[in-house]
Amino acid sequence: MDPITVILSALAVAGGKVGAKAIQDGYAALRSLILRRFGRSQPKLEERIDDYVADQEPFQKPAEKALRDAGAGTDQEVIDRAVELLRQAEADKPGITGGLVGQINAKGVVVAQTIHGGVHQTIDGSGKP
């Protein structure tokens, strides 16, 4: 699964002020982490995120490009926080993620950019690849 899609979804869902204070706090923490890590190298990143959260459709491409150019999709902490935020939002308001959490939770789905070294993945629980 594309990490930028996950990050954008988390920002859109949680930034829309839907749900509990914990979700709003999670959004603020994710946004802050992204800007802290990548804001200096991408001066328009904050504006792109804020525009996207306010109105997703016209601002999706600029926000996606800014996040990709910044390298946010390769930062595992950012990805993990986005995934957790989506899970919290889905638990608070079932269906709000449009099925994205179900896709993330599905067997065999990995939200990651690059995996270095060997990978052993068991799909059926047997312990056999």
Regions found by a protein language model. Name each.
Residues M1-L8, Y27-G108, A112-P129:
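Short amphipathic alpha-helical segments that predominantly mediate membrane engagement
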Residues A14-A29:
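Short hydrophobic alpha-helical membrane-entry/anchor segments
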